[in-house]
């Protein structure tokens, strides 16, 4: 089982799909990384040679993935909250950030319904 960017890639899958298990790597990024590394997309993860693994690791070094990407996203959200922007306020209050309606929906973001004492149907 190959370990790339701190992630154990699943056995038996094509390498282009296995790379998508890394946070920050989708199918398009995986294809670009494999093209830069000179590794065919249809090769299975089990069939990778150590040289191919090293080439993939080297090509992935130029892409922000895993911890670095998570840290950057969290810092961006913290920055929005600190400067008091509309988006930052929505993050702070736990409400949808991108303009969704909150009158009826948004249960995922708002959490479980709070029951109101004394309210009749």
Swiss-Prot record:
NCBIfam families, A to Z: uS13_bact
SUPFAM superfamilies (alphabetical): S13-like H2TH domain (SSF46946)
Comp. bias (Basic residues): 106-121
Native source organism of the sequence: Lacticaseibacillus paracasei (strain ATCC 334 / BCRC 17002 / CCUG 31169 / CIP 107868 / KCTC 3260 / NRRL B-441) (Lactobacillus paracasei)
InterPro entries from the UniProt entry: Rbsml_uS13_C, Ribosomal_uS13, Ribosomal_uS13-like_H2TH, Ribosomal_uS13_bac-type, Ribosomal_uS13_CS
Transmembrane segments: none
HAMAP family the UniProt entry points to: Ribosomal_uS13
Subunit structure: Part of the 30S ribosomal subunit. Forms a loose heterodimer with protein S19. Forms two bridges to the 50S subunit in the 70S ribosome.
Keyword Ribosomal protein among record annotations: yes
Recorded GO MF terms: rRNA binding; structural constituent of ribosome; tRNA binding
Matches recorded under Pfam families: Ribosomal_S13
GO biological process per UniProt: translation
PROSITE patterns: RIBOSOMAL_S13_1 (PS00646), RIBOSOMAL_S13_2 (PS50159)
UniProt name for this protein: Small ribosomal subunit protein uS13
Keyword tRNA-binding assigned: yes
Record-level GO cellular component terms: cytosol; small ribosomal subunit
Function: Located at the top of the head of the 30S subunit, it contacts several helices of the 16S rRNA. In the 70S ribosome it contacts the 23S rRNA (bridge B1a) and protein L5 of the 50S subunit (bridge B1b), connecting the 2 subunits; these bridges are implicated in subunit movement. Contacts the tRNAs in the A and P-sites.
Alphabetical keyword list: Ribonucleoprotein, Ribosomal protein, RNA-binding, rRNA-binding, tRNA-binding
Family membership: Belongs to the universal ribosomal protein uS13 family.
PANTHER family linked to this entry: 30S RIBOSOMAL PROTEIN S13/40S RIBOSOMAL PROTEIN S18 (PTHR10871), SMALL RIBOSOMAL SUBUNIT PROTEIN US13M (PTHR10871:SF1)
Chain segments carrying region Disordered: 91-121
Superkingdom of origin: Bacteria
